[in-house]
Amino acid sequence: MACAPLLLEQFIYKKRNFAYAFVRHRLFVLCKQSLIRVQSAEGIKRIEISPKSNLKHLYDSVQNALKVDGFGLFKERNFLTELQASGSQLVGTSLRHGDMVYLKQMAGTSSRRTSTTVLDSQAFKTSTISNPNSARPSFNVIEDDVDQALSKADGTIKRERDSKLCHHNANGRCVHCSALEPYDESYLKEHNIKHLSFHSYIRKQTSGMDQGKYFVFDDINCRIKPGCREHPPWPKGICSKCQPSAITLNRQTYRHVDNVMFENTKIVERFLNYWRTTGHQRMGYLYGTYEQHTDVPLGIRAKVAAIYEPPQESTRDSINIQPDEFADDVDAVASALGLKKIGWIFTDLITDDASIGTVKQIRGIESHFITAQECITAGELQNRHPNPCKYASNGVFGSKFVTICVTGDKTKQVHMEGYAVSAQCMALVRDNCLIPTKDAPELGYVRESTDKQYVPDVFYKEKDLYGNEVQRLARPLPVEYLLVDVPASTPLQPIYTFTEYDKRQPFPIENRYIDGHLQDFNALSCYLSAWGEEEFLEAISDFHLLVYLYKMDMLPLRQHMGPLLEAVRTKNPNQAAQFKVVDVWKLLESLIQASSGGSGGTTSYPSGGASASAGASGSEAMDLDANTWTCNHCTFINRGELTSCEICSLPR
């Protein structure tokens, strides 16, 4: 009989039956505090809470105990039934003493209650209704127009009825003539399409039974997660919760841009004139638009309308890009014209035979296609111009920014090669993990961890001498694992967003400090004087001229150029003619007429030696009262025999 209480206790408390559940529930009702177990990625945490507390209080208790934010609590391990952070629903109505709830960290901005901060009720309802039970971010992402159009497009590849294989009537469909998905491998291989388009890749990932409800692009992290309280900061401590995972580089199967098209060959020819004149390399930014590319299913094409050349110091072998104080002005003019910065272009040309115009082939499969330094520069520029994406955890993923290299091919002719770097390369460059090597331009190098920075291990796979796939540490790293090919071309029928020059001399391009290429008032006067009154819209439709007028300091044209830029964008001659009657443009025309009628003027800036010698001569060189005059525009003191200013070229 002494063993009876022990047997009863084992029967009640150790066996998962009705008696055990009944006794546990009675203890839950009688006790003022109940025990709730919370399972998260860090382990199991026990929370004591009153059964009469609401679920909002439970969320606050979990947040204070685990030091987390942006989470949800679920009843099941597979996160099906969520406990809403309600201020009216009690803990006792949803949970029992000893129950376990499962914590899930939410990506992006969460609509769930995780703190005592007051939320706007209307915003809460909107985010909850628009994206229920989904892992995608709840904030709204404004994608590019071409992305919005492709998201709504059907995307399937239509096929005609095969007269040999199809045995049905014209209205029927079979496996030989039914439409294909845009990611069909046989179609891509047949048409020699190397990479999937970005939207075809999204269609492939969202084609399952759940229709991609939980599909999301996660950002690659190469840094230690900040704020870990389990140990001292790096280098004194690190744990699995804050340590970034090792990265295995894979060749990217998709690309954000499938083709780069220059509207006409004259755009590139004007860019190459600097190299032809000086022999120095040159770099520029591509301005244009994105449009649908029909040759690739759900493809995107970058159409280039102009090339802007920022301040730079170049030699025969190198280019050093300088800070550009007018970068925002250029972007403002481009935006008013319906353009945006879509890529960058640089030259790598060495003359082989100047008499026949051939160049040396210095890039190819036997050497390299793009250097590690250029790859890092492309990654930095792509990080500055991210691609808005509604499937990304932070609202952006990848980039449509392209890289164009002008170099020599096998036939020793000048040709263009297009590239983009992968999302993995962008992450390595963003977190300062990738550097170039000194002796091999085709090899990069992943930094080693130091006291100031922890760098995760980066691996890539290649085949050894016996054909086996082996994993290598990315020290060094062939940059070909980070590249995506993007074809570059020109259309058969040229397109002209801006003026089509025939025999007239175009307006000089900015930041070219050589004779005949300077942008000054004398160049503006000579350029506009070559056009008639009825050709004003054609004369003004030059991207480099519009940028020069926009950033001109002598006349306040910037505040009045809105209608002019709209006229150029819409090619409206009547609206352009209305701009000619504006007072500030009339003043500019009068200055041009006065400058054209004078005998002075200069097309270049005075040298430093001339200025120094003039200053050294002092009052012996000129009489300030009789033999000099002061420019009303730039206040420079000019010699008396000049009829236009030696600095700004404006008339006396």
UniProtKB/Swiss-Prot annotation:
ZnF bounds (RanBP2-type): 625-652
Record-annotated MPN domain positions: 260-397
Pathway of action: Protein degradation; proteasomal ubiquitin-dependent pathway
A single cellular component GO annotation: nucleoplasm
InterPro entries named among the record's database cross-references: MPN (IPR037518), Npl4 (IPR016563), NPL4_C (IPR007717), Npl4_Ub-like_dom (IPR024682), NPL4_Zn-bd_put (IPR007716), Ubiquitin-like_domsf (IPR029071), Znf_RanBP2 (IPR001876), Znf_RanBP2_sf (IPR036443)
Chain positions found as Phosphoserine: 115, 138
GO biological process: cellular response to virus; negative regulation of smoothened signaling pathway; proteasome-mediated ubiquitin-dependent protein catabolic process; ubiquitin-dependent protein catabolic process
UniProt GO molecular function: K11-linked polyubiquitin modification-dependent protein binding; ubiquitin binding; ubiquitin protein ligase binding; zinc ion binding
Superkingdom in the source lineage: Eukaryota
Modified residues (Phosphothreonine): 114, 117
CDD domains the record matches: MPN_NPL4
Protein keywords: Metal-binding, Phosphoprotein, Ubl conjugation pathway, Zinc, Zinc-finger
Family label: Belongs to the NPL4 family.
Subunit record text: Interacts with TER94.
Job of this protein: May be part of a complex that binds ubiquitinated proteins and that is necessary for the export of misfolded proteins from the ER to the cytoplasm, where they are degraded by the proteasome.
Stated name of the protein: Nuclear protein localization protein 4 homolog
Organism listed in the record: Drosophila melanogaster
